[in-house]
């Protein structure tokens, strides 16, 4: 888990290093992983014995947001120069990514949409609820259900968004590991669904990731090509559009 977060952070540094860079990465998890927002409290509020007993990895994201249990999902990251040739301010970049996620889900005949910035709920302390227990502006929903948890980080000249796209209801199990398990479970039951649950058929992470990559290419107006991680100063395969 920590390695995945380090890679995403490194891609952000690479993207910020020149004015015309964009890279997309899809990845998975070798075991269920609890990822925490950059300033979310831990271990306070968590049942660390249960986390250890069930073999969960724990990682802290370079981005904000609240806790996500990564299991049975599709995951991706996109980092880009900002404003870049797409002339995006940081928030516009994040919204472009969310719109691409919604467009990818729409190809599966799901009525996905980005939550508009006008729908702001109450401001809660970091870690007050799991990520999927509520929707926030810039994330993706189908009806009242949150379908994608998207977190972003912005630096001078660069932006990163990475996302958890649950396929099943496994992500709701995050409630089991919280001290407020009953309350968290109730919130998740009312707000969180996986794509398979809404679609009523099986999906693979690869299917979803393929649609995401295609939608991001359209959203940013680029032709993505396979590239070695070394091209971004790393050591694994990525999809990228280097300067």
Could you describe each region identified by the protein language model?
Residues 69-82:
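DPxDG-like acidic metal-binding loop motif
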Residues 82-216, 240:
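Catalytic beta-strand/loop module used to bind and position nucleotide/cofactor moieties
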